Amino acid sequence: MNLPSPAPPTLVLASSSPYRAELLARLGLPFEICAPDIDETPLPQEQPEGLVARLAETKARVVGAKSPNALVIGSDQVAVLGQQILGKPKTHERALQQLRAASGQTVFFYTGLCLVNTLMGEAKTVVEPFQVQFRQLTEQQIDNYLQREQPYQCAGSFRSEGLGIALIQHLQGDDPNALVGLPLIRLTELLEQAGYPVL
């Protein structure tokens, strides 16, 4: 007598970000969305790479606790200018300050990605860096961009997939999707390692 094969795991995106959902949809896999409710405050002396890795895993584990047979994707991103972490500005004034500071400078974006296999209790976490060289921007250009794009929920006040491309002089990194918030190249690798091939 043949035993029934186990049900495949459910793919779950632990995010409220429409941008991440849009990126994940590009892989053509069925998935569910469950927004995590976590404290995203950095720990004392926490470095950017450690912060995004911790938050990505925390998001995936919090959502995974409700799903007994799932592959849960958590992701988090920060932008770093010099020694300062640029989070989501949330207001127009904060976004103005961030983009004034970024004008003519190099900003490093770090995207943490975690895949939790709830059946096995395993988590794999990676951090994908990306470097953005901003053009010298006038006050008028910054204001025009913010009025049109309103990137107040985006790390560093910047959306590369939209009008934000007009702010950029140069990009450097392995996966442009990481800038939007979900590194699909690394995610494909993690899914395949978990026995969930994309192709």
From Swiss-Prot:
Top-level EC class as recorded in UniProt: hydrolase
> Which InterPro entries does the UniProt record give?
ITPase-like_fam, Maf-like
- Cofactor(s) required for function per UniProt: a divalent metal cation
User: What catalytic activity does the UniProt entry give for this protein?
Assistant: N(7)-methyl-GTP + H2O = N(7)-methyl-GMP + diphosphate + H(+)
Protein's UniProt keywords contain GTP-binding:
no
Primary localisation category: cytoplasm
Q: GO annotations under biological process?
A: nucleotide metabolic process
| Membrane-spanning intervals of the chain | none
* Residues at the catalytic site: 76
The record ties this protein, via Pfam families, to: Maf
Return the annotated site residues (Important for substrate specificity). 19, 77, 161
The EC code for this enzyme is: 3.6.1.-
Q: Which residues form the signal peptide?
A: none
Task: Write out the function statement from the record.
Answer: Nucleoside triphosphate pyrophosphatase that hydrolyzes 7-methyl-GTP (m(7)GTP). May have a dual role in cell division arrest and in preventing the incorporation of modified nucleotides into cellular nucleic acids.
What this protein is called in its record is 7-methyl-GTP pyrophosphatase
